[in-house]
Protein backbone atom coordinates (compact mmCIF):
# COMPACT_ATOMS: atom_id res chain seq x y z
CA UNK A 1 0.00 0.00 0.00
CA UNK A 2 1.66 3.26 -1.10
CA UNK A 3 1.73 6.39 1.01
CA UNK A 4 -0.06 9.57 -0.06
CA UNK A 5 3.33 11.12 -0.81
CA UNK A 6 4.31 8.23 -3.07
CA UNK A 7 1.01 8.54 -4.97
CA UNK A 8 1.53 12.29 -5.40
CA UNK A 9 5.00 11.65 -6.84
CA UNK A 10 4.26 8.61 -8.98
CA UNK A 11 0.50 8.20 -9.43
CA UNK A 12 -1.37 5.05 -10.40
CA UNK A 13 -0.62 3.29 -13.69
CA UNK A 14 -3.75 2.70 -15.77
CA UNK A 15 -3.96 -0.86 -17.09
CA UNK A 16 -4.31 -0.87 -20.87
CA UNK A 17 -6.74 -3.39 -22.35
CA UNK A 18 -5.11 -5.53 -25.04
CA UNK A 19 -7.26 -6.64 -27.99
CA UNK A 20 -7.85 -10.39 -28.41
CA UNK A 21 -8.07 -9.95 -32.19
CA UNK A 22 -5.71 -7.10 -33.14
CA UNK A 23 -5.80 -7.76 -36.90
CA UNK A 24 -9.50 -6.80 -37.02
CA UNK A 25 -8.64 -3.20 -36.01
CA UNK A 26 -12.04 -2.72 -34.33
CA UNK A 27 -13.99 -4.04 -37.35
CA UNK A 28 -16.60 -6.80 -36.92
CA UNK A 29 -15.27 -8.67 -39.98
CA UNK A 30 -12.51 -8.32 -42.55
CA UNK A 31 -12.14 -9.63 -46.09
CA UNK A 32 -9.05 -11.56 -47.05
CA UNK A 33 -7.45 -13.94 -49.53
CA UNK A 34 -6.37 -17.47 -48.55
CA UNK A 35 -2.65 -17.97 -48.99
CA UNK A 36 -2.57 -21.53 -47.63
CA UNK A 37 -5.28 -24.05 -46.66
CA UNK A 38 -4.16 -26.94 -44.49
CA UNK A 39 -4.92 -29.13 -41.45
CA UNK A 40 -3.25 -29.02 -38.07
CA UNK A 41 -3.43 -31.03 -34.86
CA UNK A 42 -4.79 -29.65 -31.56
CA UNK A 43 -3.06 -29.48 -28.18
CA UNK A 44 -3.21 -32.38 -25.73
CA UNK A 45 -5.52 -34.03 -24.67
CA UNK A 46 -7.47 -33.56 -27.94
CA UNK A 47 -6.81 -35.36 -31.19
CA UNK A 48 -8.10 -34.39 -34.65
CA UNK A 49 -7.16 -32.79 -37.96
CA UNK A 50 -8.48 -29.24 -37.67
CA UNK A 51 -9.01 -27.33 -40.92
CA UNK A 52 -7.32 -23.92 -40.92
CA UNK A 53 -6.31 -21.31 -43.50
CA UNK A 54 -3.66 -18.65 -43.59
CA UNK A 55 -5.40 -15.48 -44.79
CA UNK A 56 -3.95 -12.16 -45.97
CA UNK A 57 -6.43 -9.48 -44.91
CA UNK A 58 -7.20 -6.27 -46.81
CA UNK A 59 -5.38 -4.28 -44.12
CA UNK A 60 -2.15 -6.21 -44.75
CA UNK A 61 -2.24 -8.54 -41.74
CA UNK A 62 -1.64 -12.25 -42.30
CA UNK A 63 -3.61 -14.38 -39.84
CA UNK A 64 -4.40 -18.05 -39.25
CA UNK A 65 -8.15 -18.62 -39.13
CA UNK A 66 -10.31 -21.66 -38.45
CA UNK A 67 -12.75 -23.20 -40.93
CA UNK A 68 -15.72 -24.49 -38.90
CA UNK A 69 -18.20 -27.19 -39.92
CA UNK A 70 -17.92 -30.45 -41.85
CA UNK A 71 -16.26 -30.15 -45.26
CA UNK A 72 -15.31 -26.97 -47.14
CA UNK A 73 -14.50 -25.77 -50.66
CA UNK A 74 -11.61 -23.43 -49.85
CA UNK A 75 -8.36 -23.38 -51.77
CA UNK A 76 -5.54 -20.95 -52.34
CA UNK A 77 -6.70 -17.52 -53.65
CA UNK A 78 -10.25 -18.01 -52.30
CA UNK A 79 -11.73 -14.74 -50.99
CA UNK A 80 -13.14 -15.14 -47.47
CA UNK A 81 -14.71 -13.11 -44.67
CA UNK A 82 -12.86 -13.36 -41.35
CA UNK A 83 -14.34 -12.68 -37.90
CA UNK A 84 -12.75 -12.74 -34.46
CA UNK A 85 -12.97 -15.69 -32.09
CA UNK A 86 -10.23 -18.05 -31.02
CA UNK A 87 -10.04 -21.84 -31.09
CA UNK A 88 -9.06 -22.99 -27.61
CA UNK A 89 -7.10 -26.10 -28.59
CA UNK A 90 -5.22 -24.55 -31.55
CA UNK A 91 -2.44 -22.20 -30.42
CA UNK A 92 -2.14 -19.11 -32.62
CA UNK A 93 -5.62 -19.45 -34.17
CA UNK A 94 -7.51 -16.32 -33.06
CA UNK A 95 -9.95 -15.91 -35.95
CA UNK A 96 -12.80 -17.78 -37.66
CA UNK A 97 -13.83 -17.78 -41.31
CA UNK A 98 -17.53 -16.94 -41.86
CA UNK A 99 -19.36 -19.80 -43.61
CA UNK A 100 -21.75 -19.03 -46.47
CA UNK A 101 -20.22 -15.69 -47.49
CA UNK A 102 -17.97 -14.77 -50.44
CA UNK A 103 -16.12 -17.87 -51.76
CA UNK A 104 -16.79 -20.20 -48.80
CA UNK A 105 -20.02 -22.19 -49.12
CA UNK A 106 -22.25 -23.11 -46.20
CA UNK A 107 -22.26 -26.58 -44.65
CA UNK A 108 -24.25 -29.07 -46.74
CA UNK A 109 -27.24 -30.91 -45.18
CA UNK A 110 -27.02 -28.94 -41.92
CA UNK A 111 -30.32 -29.01 -39.98
CA UNK A 112 -29.50 -27.39 -36.63
CA UNK A 113 -27.54 -24.21 -35.80
CA UNK A 114 -27.80 -23.35 -39.50
CA UNK A 115 -27.10 -19.62 -39.15
CA UNK A 116 -23.64 -20.32 -37.72
CA UNK A 117 -22.71 -22.41 -40.75
CA UNK A 118 -24.39 -20.48 -43.58
CA UNK A 119 -26.82 -23.30 -44.40
CA UNK A 120 -30.11 -22.58 -46.17
CA UNK A 121 -33.43 -23.76 -44.72
CA UNK A 122 -34.18 -27.27 -46.01
CA UNK A 123 -37.25 -27.73 -48.22
CA UNK A 124 -40.26 -28.91 -46.17
CA UNK A 125 -41.92 -32.07 -47.45
Swiss-Prot record:
Please give the residue ranges the record annotates as the region Disordered.
105-125
Q: Return the Basic residues bias intervals.
A: 113-125
Keywords from the named record: Methylation, Ribonucleoprotein, Ribosomal protein, RNA-binding, rRNA-binding, tRNA-binding
Record-linked Pfam families = Ribosom_S12_S23
MF GO annotations:
rRNA binding; structural constituent of ribosome; tRNA binding
Q: Which InterPro entries match?
A: NA-bd_OB-fold (IPR012340), Ribosomal_uS12 (IPR006032), Ribosomal_uS12_bac (IPR005679)
3-methylthioaspartic acid is found on 89
- One of the GO BP terms on file: translation
Signal peptide coordinates:
none
**Matching SUPFAM superfamilies:** Nucleic acid-binding proteins
Q: Could you state one GO cellular component term attached to this entry?
A: small ribosomal subunit
Q: Which segments of the protein form a coiled coil according to its record?
A: none
What is the purpose of this protein?
With S4 and S5 plays an important role in translational accuracy. Interacts with and stabilizes bases of the 16S rRNA that are involved in tRNA selection in the A site and with the mRNA backbone. Located at the interface of the 30S and 50S subunits, it traverses the body of the 30S subunit contacting proteins on the other side and probably holding the rRNA structure together. The combined cluster of proteins S8, S12 and S17 appears to hold together the shoulder and platform of the 30S subunit.
Q: Hey, which family's this protein in?
A: Belongs to the universal ribosomal protein uS12 family.
Q: How does it assemble?
A: Part of the 30S ribosomal subunit. Contacts proteins S8 and S17. May interact with IF1 in the 30S initiation complex.
Q: What is this protein called?
A: Small ribosomal subunit protein uS12
Amino acid sequence: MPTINQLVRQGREVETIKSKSPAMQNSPQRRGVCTRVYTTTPKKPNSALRKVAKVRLTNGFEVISYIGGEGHNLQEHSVVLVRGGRVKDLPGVRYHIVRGSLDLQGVKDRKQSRSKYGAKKPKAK
